[in-house]
Each structure stands twice: as C-alpha cells, then as structure tokens.
Amino acid sequence: MLKNIFYIIMGPPGSGKGTQSQCLAEKLGLPHISSGNLLRSAIKASTPLGIKASEYIDEGQLVPNGLVWEIVQETLNKSECLSGCIIDGFPRTLDQAVLLHDFLVKANADYRVIQLDVADEEIIRRIYSRFICPSCNFVYNQSQGFRECPTCHSELVRRSDDTLEVIQKRLESYKNTTASVIDYYADLGKLTCVPAEKSPDEVFQSILACIED
C-alpha cells in the first residue's frame, strides 16, 4: 500500500465517497480534501467564491470549473499535501480531470482513481436519511439516532439541496458530466470501480483490497 500517492474517490452524490475518503485518509495518514466541504466553508464564510458557488449549488447545478479548481489547487499546493492526499468530489468534468492530471504530472506525483458504483434508488434513500454537522462537515445517518454532532456538539442539519427534485437534478448532471471523466481515467489505466451498496465497512475493505494490488 502506497502513501506517497494521490487517491481520487469518485461516485454520485450519496455514494459514500466522503465517508470512504475519510476512512482512507485515517488509514494512510494522508490529508483528506473534499471540494464540497471546501466550497461549503467558503459559502459559510461568504467569500466571493462562496457567494458565487452557492447560487449553483442551491439549484443542484455544478459549480463552474474555474471556481472549483482555484480553491482545490490552492489546497493541493500546501506542504501537508506534498506526500499525497485523498481527494473526493473532484474532478467532476473532463476539463477538471485534465487540469488535475496535468498538475499531478508536473508535480511528479502518481495517482489512482476509485469509482464507487451505487444505483439511483439507493442514492435517493441514502440522501434522504443523512444529516450533516455544519461545523465539522461530518455526515451521519438518521438510523444512528444523533441529534447533535458527537464530536463538536453542533446541531445536525439537512443540506438545503437534499430535496428530491434537486437530488434528481444532481444525479442527472453527474451522469452527463462524469461519463467522459470515467472514460478518461479508464483510458489512462488509472480507474478501479468498486460496488458500494454494502455496509461502509465492507466497501472500505473492498477499497483497501484494490489499492493493495
């Protein structure tokens, strides 16, 4: 298992990529970069980027490439990411994939892509049952019975874009934009697909088996 490598975790909204990315980051001792969390932090702080991004996210649309890449690249350039990191929520478009590939090649870094496969029906069920900590961005399932975050004790909330109409838009948008990304990484020999409808622990073990090959 390599540590000095970048792992890109892909999958539709609600596929568990945030949870799996965090688990992998803890296992390998690498930073976890979530473009979604970075954008939400910018929105919460009302930065110029955050204000622009919120208009797209609230409508279930993808944030334009330039806005997302600016904040992701800034984070990747930090010293703690020099030995590798776990990236989730990025790239979502072919343009973003090329930008990230060129950045990593220039940095003489290797990377692998893990695609989490989940059916639409399961995605909708998962998203309807999830709650978010607005402070530390951890995701919890309704079945866990938490009303506040066990870590920071903030009240758990639903995301404003976790409605059926917006979820369906996001799924359709994801499929339309990421098909070319998946093909791009497959052609480069970087892609591994992992079935992700089992329990989080079982999915994580499947991911570990893939990266240990």
UniProtKB/Swiss-Prot annotation:
GO molecular function: adenylate kinase activity; ATP binding; zinc ion binding
Keywords: ATP-binding, Cytoplasm, Kinase, Metal-binding, Nucleotide biosynthesis, Nucleotide-binding, Transferase, Zinc
Subunit structure: Monomer.
Enzyme Commission code: 2.7.4.3
Listed pathway(s): Purine metabolism; AMP biosynthesis via salvage pathway; AMP from ADP: step 1/1
Class in the EC hierarchy, top level: transferase
Family the UniProt entry places it in: Belongs to the adenylate kinase family.
Protein name: Adenylate kinase
Species this chain originates from: Chlamydia felis (strain Fe/C-56) (Chlamydophila felis)
Catalytic activity: AMP + ATP = 2 ADP
GO terms classed as biological process: AMP salvage
UniProt domain comment: Consists of three domains, a large central CORE domain and two small peripheral domains, NMPbind and LID, which undergo movements during catalysis. The LID domain closes over the site of phosphoryl transfer upon ATP binding. Assembling and dissambling the active center during each catalytic cycle provides an effective means to prevent ATP hydrolysis. Some bacteria have evolved a zinc-coordinating structure that stabilizes the LID domain.
Gene3D superfamilies reported for this sequence: P-loop containing nucleotide triphosphate hydrolases (3.40.50.300)
Upper lineage: Bacteria, Pseudomonadati, Chlamydiota, Chlamydiia, Chlamydiales
Classification via InterPro entries: Adenyl_kin_sub (IPR006259), Adenylat/UMP-CMP_kin (IPR000850), Adenylat_kinase_CS (IPR033690), P-loop_NTPase (IPR027417)
Binding residues annotated for AMP, in chain numbering: 35, 40, 61-63, 89-92, 96, 159, 170
Top-level taxonomic group: Bacteria
